[in-house]
């Protein structure tokens, strides 16, 4: 499993309240959530994000409220992967459960710049900055988590397992 795209970069402690503000939690429609993704932090996010882009952030990404709406809005906006120094644990699990690829790599999260082009090999945990040529070793997903993400989330993974 791989991802490749342009970087949209944020800092530390990006919480679920700025990923998808609480005023939009009355819907579970992914397209509607995507239309408001990051708007309290980056009002131009929905205008500049392209399918396949990669979000990069610092420490504690996804902290705050335990809402699946946050990774759903990111995934539905077209982001193919989130790279961060660290993730809040509940966000990490919610991302896997809805099929949003994420990867922790402190060095990459610090070095990669906004608008860089990156490629991620999830099987190996490799992140390559195509703009600078530098390669980083992130933490690869265990095989069962890769299977969940490849199935587009836990629900589909279970459905596939039962059929």
UniProtKB/Swiss-Prot annotation:
UniProt keyword Lyase, yes or no: yes
Catalytic activity annotation: (2R,3S)-3-isopropylmalate = (2S)-2-isopropylmalate
GO biological process assignments: L-leucine biosynthetic process
Keyword line: Amino-acid biosynthesis, Branched-chain amino acid biosynthesis, Leucine biosynthesis, Lyase
Annotated transmembrane regions: none
Record EC number: 4.2.1.33
Descriptive protein name: 3-isopropylmalate dehydratase small subunit
Organism of provenance: Ruminiclostridium cellulolyticum (strain ATCC 35319 / DSM 5812 / JCM 6584 / H10)
């Amino acid at each position: 499993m791989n991802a490749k795209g342009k970087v949209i970069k944020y800092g530390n402690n990006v919480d679920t309240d700025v990923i998808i503000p609480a005023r939009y939690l009355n819907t579970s429609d992914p397209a509607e959530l995507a239309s408001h993704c990051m708007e309290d932090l980056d009002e131009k996010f929905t205008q500049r994000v392209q399918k396949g882009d990669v979000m990069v952030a610092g420490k504690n990404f996804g902290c705050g409220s335990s809402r699946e709406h946050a990774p759903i809005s990111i995934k539905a906006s077209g982001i193919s992967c989130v790279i961060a120094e660290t993730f809040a644990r509940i966000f990490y699990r919610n991302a896997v459960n809805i099929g949003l690829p994420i990867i922790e790599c402190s060095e990459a999260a610090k070095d990669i710049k906004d608008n860089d082009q990156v490629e991620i090999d999830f099987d190996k945990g490799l992140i390559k900055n195509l703009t600078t040529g530098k390669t980083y070793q992130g933490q690869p997903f265990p095989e069962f988590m890769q299977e969940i993400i490849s199935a587009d989330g836990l629900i589909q993974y279970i459905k596939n397992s039962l059929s």
